[in-house]
């Protein structure tokens, strides 16, 4: 119900949260405007909606994502970088403004409207967008000619631009880096595009796409792996851990039983997990351009549940999931973060947190019934074709 109320019916776009300026740290500066739609949410939204049987809503959001892809490719002039976020109507003027005459909850400042991250380079969005398209395609709604042409243009662009620093999934304001998560998602983008092209017989430069996909894989496995930490790290020049990498087995980049992955998960257990709750990373060890600290991330905790379940630690996954449920409010809703004393922090309710909750519940239930592994339960279940929107 909450996710449907956060969806703009004319376009199917889902806002990240209906609020702005609720602080990630009481009295701190980590206050953002979330009243927009992130491309990043697409894959996780489509997966959750399909898992709950809301195929029409999944198709509508998938079509909204495709429309954004078409805007940046398929016109015969090559592709251009997508924006990472848009207004619900698809426009992208999100200039950030500080409202000096306001203060947020318990004096938290500054209060911002708009979002300066809209102009950042975040290469992971291509993986999340193509994963959403692939999930929709797997349920019968294949890309139309214009849509596929735009996707092909976009993948050709990505082949030429994936190997560069960006601001990353956490939208840091401390400079661009070679973030491992972004590289993983670039691999996802090309992998899913190859699957669609081969499965549907669509024209594509498959040799180029496969070559670059494999180059990304080799780079991540060598430069993303830190032999001293015995873990995959946040970016190539650090020993800092990052819970965004919990998606590596979720996206099929590594086996959930790969020894390198199991060592990474063990390292996260020790450094990023506190009483079953998961931090994104250590801001003091990896400066992100902002002051202060933050709470644990609800999204990351649910990713942790999923990763534990797929890696065979079903008892641990159940315990973390049950513990996390105790932090919801009286309506079962979550904000973006949870503080050290159990208070909810950040914008509320946050779509990403609830999408991750749904996905973790679906996957945990499937693993408990069928045994741990990397089978994708939504696609493993029988399901009819998705109706074409409109």
Q: Where in the sequence are the language-model features?
A:
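Acidic, mature catalytic/reactive cores of soluble proteins
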Residues: 1-390
